[in-house]
Amino acid sequence: DGISLEDLLEKRTGNMMQPQLAEKIAKATRKEFVDGIAAHGTDALRFTLAALASNGRDINWDMKRLEGYRNFCNKLWNASRFVLTNDKLDLSQGEIEFSVADRWIQSEFNRTVESFRSALSQYRFDLCANAIYEFTWNQFCDWYLELTKPVFANGNAAQIRAASQTLVHVLEKLLRLAHPLIPFITEEIWQKVKGFVGITADSIMLQPFPQVEENGFDPEAEAEIEWLKEVIVAVRNIRAESNIAPSKGLDLLFRNLSAENAKILEKQTALLKAMAKLDNVQVLAANETHASVAKLVGNAELLVPMAGFINKEAELARLTKEIEKYQNEVKRIENKLSNEAFVAKAPKAVITKEREKQAEYQSGLEKIQEQYKAIEAL
């Protein structure tokens, strides 16, 4: 429910064993919690406590973690609303054709159940929370929901039925898996989901806890989607680095593509085009060259021709300024670390942080220089 600053001060300084510390604690409290503590919700608090409950140490409370897990609860709520309000959802009887994405998310959920139950048997509630968070945010929300959009937009009836069934069934099972950690939001959402999967029970608490399905693992689908994800992320990074709008279609060229990945590409070209906003996808011969921006995915080279997408001179001028900026930062830190007086007096943690910053700037400089060379070659 949160707490006002006045009530928080009273709690932290009232009935103290060492009243002489009251003023110091009050000052620190006013500085850290200017407006008190806002309401974050019971589920977010429970999830935070579970995530911090690793073995053999005291909990070092972090309000940022609480805020992050409140956002996680919001993410789950919004994802559920996206599923349940999808006007193209089709749960009718008929032929179904599961896509590689449908198979992948079901396999990933099965692995999540395995991880969760293993952690629970060892009372590692932190690992339970991490398993739920990783699957919900990084797999289900960030990827699977996006992978279903091309199906609902352009898929046939059998594919749409398969995606619809997968969405609601995985969501329902996920709510059951997460219920021990975040009982209130999962109950609330489950009451809306249960009708979609034909359940008539009164409460999620009366449902069986998810079990690992021995035949529920699909390594082939996992490998295909993981490779496609790497390619999609690489193309998106090229867009971001070259300031190309997400709505503009690109051509994507592959070089040194393995036979295994070539088969994946052949099967999943349509999905890749939709997810990465590509106009054309082509595999080049090993010695064939093109003036393009390149990224590596494994041993394969991804080439994106940039002619017509950017103003070459303006982009080179922009990158030149960036290079100068990073060079100046690297030089500034080098000068600081070469100053014997600074090194002798500065705390070890400060020196370590400066070295980390130096490494970050050096890495950034090298990446920008690579971009410069690629644009210069166009």
Curated annotation (Swiss-Prot):
Coiled coil: 307-377
Keyword tags: Aminoacyl-tRNA synthetase, ATP-binding, Coiled coil, Cytoplasm, Ligase, Nucleotide-binding, Protein biosynthesis
Record-linked SUPFAM superfamilies: Anticodon-binding domain of a subclass of class I aminoacyl-tRNA synthetases, Nucleotidylyl transferase, tRNA-binding arm
Tagged with keyword Signal: no
Reactions performed catalytically: tRNA(Val) + L-valine + ATP = L-valyl-tRNA(Val) + AMP + diphosphate
Gene Ontology CC, one term: cytosol
Pfam families reported for this sequence: Anticodon_1, Val_tRNA-synt_C
Intrachain disulfide bonds: none
Protein location: Cytoplasm
Keyword Aminoacyl-tRNA synthetase among UniProt keywords: yes
EC code: 6.1.1.9
GO molecular function annotations of the record: ATP binding; valine-tRNA ligase activity
BP GO terms, sorted: valyl-tRNA aminoacylation
Gene3D superfamilies noted in UniProt: Isoleucyl-tRNA Synthetase, Domain 1, Valyl-tRNA synthetase, C-terminal domain
Main EC class the enzyme belongs to: ligase
UniProt family annotation: Belongs to the class-I aminoacyl-tRNA synthetase family. ValS type 1 subfamily.
UniProt function note: Catalyzes the attachment of valine to tRNA(Val). As ValRS can inadvertently accommodate and process structurally similar amino acids such as threonine, to avoid such errors, it has a 'posttransfer' editing activity that hydrolyzes mischarged Thr-tRNA(Val) in a tRNA-dependent manner.
Subunit architecture: Monomer.
UniProt remark on domains: ValRS has two distinct active sites: one for aminoacylation and one for editing. The misactivated threonine is translocated from the active site to the editing site. The C-terminal coiled-coil domain is crucial for aminoacylation activity.
Protein name, entry field: Valine--tRNA ligase
Species assigned in the record: Haemophilus parainfluenzae
